[in-house]
Each structure stands twice: as structure tokens, then as C-alpha cells.
């Protein structure tokens, strides 16, 4: 926190900066009263100030007894004290004895209780502080005295700022208090270096994880390609430092299994008390049943590999409401019926969608349909998906649809829910568009055509309400801007499109402003 000095225009000395803190104390009768503490910051005091202090201001003393807090400014042109020099010196000496602070300081601290306090207390107390560091120390010490607010007042412009123990300025003051301590700063930097080195680490086996010297710094654990051990400490029962529920440190937020991992997941696999694990990613080979209540309730992201195809019964996926993202791989063809409410992002493989056609006589699950919660907002298809999209495949709550790399099928407005606001077509998608391809309700705002798209954009094939339109690097068709919806605001093309000069009627848009962006 900085203590500013303000130069007065009419005098050759500096005006005051006042810092006031409001705190609640108990008097001898156990009644609450306000104690106001003011710090007056003097840089240079004019030689005549001591003479002016003896002039007038009797009325100010009477008003001060009725205020909950008093700001002492000592600005010599505006505020004069009517206190006898001898009594003033006596108060200073009494209070300096209490504070053990030298009287030679240019900084003063004055404390005045309200009129409800006991008569034995001083009307005012003056403490001298040696420098700005002592002022910071005093303000920090207020946190132990039930301080409510800290008020900084500039007498030059009558502006003031109020700080409290919860705001960023107060916390910044505490931060610098620690950071300026040489020992504490070195300790912080030392642990920061260890965190940077070991917060993310790869292990080949559980033994190396259990014996890892810097376990407490781990946040992301990755197991190597060949790792395939049961997640149990049975083989380490002679190790007294760990119990069966502490394979992973409580600091870990993400676990990524390698390609070969294919072990059962049970209630002993993860610590039931773990509240930090938020992301779990299985490898391509994983295809094991998961017991109910085995996955940590703190999970927010869950990703299965390409070969996973085990049914998920009710209770397998955490019902805590924290789970926000689930991703299934290519092989998954089980009915999706128990996705917890609260999941916002869902990625499914091609086989899961194919089973919903209900026309595969060899599929035992063809009489079951997927059930999605209304919380799903982002719907993604696996990169290998390239089947026809059946009506109802995409949930009606979805806002964004993203197709996979291989998808290259015609689409119709019946396949895309009216709730969708953004569509991202896959890398290979290159199908013609007509007036029945996309929803016309006006909710669709953004379309991204990817790498291979190169179809003519005709009139009325894009819906009204569309604002953002992006074309891939291979697009080389002429675009008549009059054929685009009047709502278009941003057009994005690859740099190669700019040299083709294929934008028509750009100057005949009737004062309509379209931002054209070229990217690399």
C-alpha cells in the first residue's frame, strides 16, 4: 500500500494524508463504542505551524465528543488546535510511553474513543511512527484488533478511500509484507521451483509413485505406455507409510493412464476422502467394469478410451453434480441411459449413435434408446463417426454441435435441434447446402466450415440470424455478399482466398458493415 504526499499550492509544506481505521471495543461497562485511529502523514511542516496551533477552535473540541470517529488532519491553513502546549506535550509523552516509539518521527497516530467510554481514558492519544514501514506494520496489526475499515483521506482534494480486511488492497499489503521478508521470499521461490518441476510427472509403476520424494507437489500424474498394475497397495502391505486408500496424494487433480492399462476399478482404487481429483482419463486398452461408487465424487471430467464398451449402471458415474464432461470412444455401443444431471459436455463414438437406429437385428440393445439430461450444452462426435444422423440423436438442450474428422454426410434441419447456436463441421465435411439443411428459427449464430469444404453458397441456404461465418483454407468459390443473411457481422477466410478476389457486391451492401478477417 502506498502513502502518497500531496503538495499544497498556497503553502511551502506538504498537506496531510489521513488513514482512519474503525474498530469495535468494549469499555469497562462491557458496552460497545467506536475507536477511531488516525494516522497523519507529515513530510515537511512549515516553521510557523506551532504558532498557529494556539489560536482558535474551541467549538471543535465540543463536537469531537459526539462523533463516533474523528479524523485529525493538522493541516495548518484549515484546522487549528486550541490545546495548551503543556497538556499536548503531556499527552504525547503518556502515549509514547505506552507505545515505546520515538518522538522524533514525522508520522503520528492518534486514537480517540467515543463519548461513551470511561472518563479515565485520554481524550486523545498521539503515537509517533518512525517511517512508512511502521505505518504498514501498524495497519497490519489492526487485523488482530477487530478492525472493520481502513480509511485513507487526502486533505488536498478531500478524497478518501476505504479498505477492509477482505478487499484486494488489504491482501496486497499483506503480500508485500511477506514478500519483503528475505527468508520467506526464498522459501516461496524454493517451493515454487519444486512445484514447477514435479507438479506433473510420469511414472512407470506404483512403487515409484509411492516412494516419490516430492509427492506433495504432484497435481497431474501420468502413467507410462506399458503401465498395467492393479490400483491396490496389497503388494505394499509392509509399507507403514501408506494405507490402502492413499495410493494417490490428496494434491492430485488429474490422472492419465497409459495405453496398456486395463485393470478393474473398485472402491479401493481411489481414496474416498479425495476431494481434489477432478480429471480422469483412461487409455485406449481399458475395457473393465467399474463398480458403483468407485469413482471420486469430485470428478468434473471423465474420458474413456477407444476400446471401452462396458455398460454403465446407475451409480457408476458420480451423482454429486460435479461431473461436467464425459467422453466415450469409438467402440462404445451400450445404451447411454444414466448420464448424471449437470453434465454439460458429451462426446460419443460412432457405434453409440448407430445403435439408436433400432435397425440392427444383431444388437441386443436395439430396443433401448439413449437418455440425455437437459443440462447438456455441447455435443461432440468421435473423430471416426461417419454415419447418418437420426432425428433425436442430438439432445434438444444442446447449444453447440461439433462433428468429427471423418464425418461427411448430408444434413437436414430435422437432425439439428432448434436450440443449437453454433455448428462446427468436421475436417472432411464437403456437402452442398440448401434452404432445408439448417434450422430457420434464428437461433443459429455461428457456422464453421472446415478444411475440405468447397461448396457454392446460394441465396437462402444460410438461416437469418447468422452472425459469424468461417470458411476453410481450400474454399475457392465465388461469394455474393447479397446472398448472405443480412445479420452477418463477421466473415473469416484463409489468406489464400484474399488473392482470388471472389467477394462480389462488397460495395453494394446499403451501408451494412461486415468485418472480413483473413487468417493463416
Swiss-Prot record:
Keywords from the named record: Repeat
Residue span of region Disordered: 47-86, 100-121
Record flagged with keyword Repeat: yes
Classification via Pfam families: FNIP
Repeat as UniProt keyword: yes
TM ranges: none
InterPro entries in UniProt: FNIP (IPR008615), STK_FNIP-Repeat (IPR051251)
FNIP repeat placement: 242-285, 286-331, 332-406, 453-496
Residue stretches of biased makeup (Low complexity): 51-84
PANTHER family from the UniProt entry: FNIP REPEAT-CONTAINING PROTEIN, FNIP REPEAT-CONTAINING PROTEIN-RELATED
The name this protein goes by in its record: FNIP repeat-containing protein DDB_G0274063/DDB_G0272642
Species name: Dictyostelium discoideum
Amino acid at each position: 500500500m502506498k502513502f502518497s504526499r500531496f503538495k499544497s499550492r498556497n503553502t511551502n509544506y506538504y498537506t496531510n494524508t489521513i488513514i482512519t481505521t474503525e474498530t469495535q471495543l468494549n469499555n469497562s461497562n462491557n458496552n460497545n463504542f467506536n475507536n477511531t485511529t488516525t494516522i497523519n502523514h507529515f513530510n515537511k511542516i512549515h516553521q510557523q505551524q506551532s504558532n498557529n496551533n494556539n489560536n482558535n477552535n474551541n467549538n471543535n473540541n465540543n463536537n469531537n465528543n459526539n462523533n463516533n470517529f474523528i479524523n485529525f488532519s493538522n493541516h495548518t491553513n484549515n484546522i487549528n488546535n486550541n490545546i495548551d502546549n503543556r497538556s499536548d506535550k503531556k499527552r504525547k509523552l503518556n502515549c509514547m510511553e505506552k507505545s515505546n516509539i520515538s518522538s522524533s518521527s514525522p508520522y503520528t497516530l492518534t486514537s480517540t474513543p467515543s463519548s461513551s467510554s470511561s472518563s479515565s481514558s485520554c481524550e486523545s492519544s498521539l503515537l509517533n511512527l518512525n517511517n512508512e514501514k511502521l505505518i504498514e506494520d501498524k495497519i497490519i496489526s489492526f487485523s488482530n484488533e477487530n478492525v472493520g475499515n481502513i480509511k485513507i483521506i487526502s486533505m488536498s482534494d478531500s478524497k478518501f478511500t476505504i479498505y477492509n480486511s477482505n478487499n484486494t488492497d488489504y491482501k496486497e499489503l499483506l503480500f508485500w509484507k511477506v514478500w519483503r521478508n528475505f527468508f520467506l521470499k526464498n522459501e516461496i521461490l524454493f517451493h515454487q521451483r519444486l512445484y514447477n518441476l514435479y507438479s506433473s510427472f510420469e511414472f512407470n509403476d506404483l512403487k515409484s509413485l509411492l516412494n516419490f520424494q516430492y509427492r506433495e507437489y504432484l497435481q497431474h500424474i501420468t502413467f507410462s505406455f506399458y503401465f498395467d498394475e492393479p490400483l491396490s497397495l496389497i503388494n505394499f502391505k509392509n509399507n507403514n507409510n501408506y494405507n490402502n486408500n492413499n495410493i494417490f496424494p490428496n494434491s492430485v487433480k488429474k490422472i492419465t493412464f497409459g495405453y496398456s492399462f486395463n485393470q478393474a476399478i473398485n472402491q479401493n482404487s481411489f481414496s474416498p476422502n479425495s476431494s481434489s481429483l477432478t480429471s480422469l482419463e483412461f487409455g485406449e486398452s481399458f475395457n473393465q467394469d467399474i463398480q458403483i461408487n468407485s469413482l471420486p465424487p469430485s470428478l468434473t471430467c471423465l474420458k474413456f478410451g477407444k476400446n471401452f464398451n462396458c455398460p454403465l449402471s446407475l451409480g457408476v458415474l458420480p451423482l454429486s453434480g460435479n461431473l461436467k464432461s464425459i467422453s466415450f470412444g469409438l467402440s462404445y455401443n451400450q445404451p447411454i441411459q444414466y448420464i448424471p444431471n449437470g453434465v454439460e459436455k458429451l462426446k460419443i463414438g460412432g457405434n453409440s449413435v448407430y445403435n439408436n437406429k433400432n435397425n440392427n437385428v444383431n444388437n441386443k440393445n436395439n430396443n433401448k434408446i439413449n437418455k440425455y439430461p437437459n443440462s447438456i450444452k455441447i455435443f461432440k462426435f468421435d473423430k471416426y463417426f461417419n454415419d447418418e444422423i437420426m432425428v433425436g440423436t442430438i439432445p434438444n438442450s444442446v447449444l453447440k454441435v461439433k462433428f468429427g474428422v471423418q464425418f461427411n454426410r448430408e444434413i437436414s434441419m430435422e437432425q439439428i435441434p432448434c436450440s443449437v447456436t453454433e455448428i462446427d463441421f468436421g475436417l472432411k465435411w464437403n456437402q452442398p447446402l440448401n434452404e432445408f439443411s439448417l434450422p430457420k428459427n434464428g437461433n443459429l449464430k455461428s457456422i464453421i466450415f472446415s478444411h475440405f469444404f468447397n461448396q457454392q453458397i446460394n441465396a437462402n441456404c444460410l438461416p437469418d440470424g447468422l452472425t459469424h461465418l468461417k470458411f476453410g483454407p481450400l474454399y475457392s468459390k465465388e461469394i455474393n455478399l447479397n446472398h448472405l443473411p443480412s445479420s452477418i457481422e463477421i466473415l473469416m477466410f484463409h489468406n489464400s482466398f484474399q488473392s482470388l478476389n471472389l467477394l462480389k457486391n462488397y460495395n453494394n451492401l446499403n451501408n451494412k458493415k461486415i468485418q472480413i478477417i483473413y487468417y493463416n
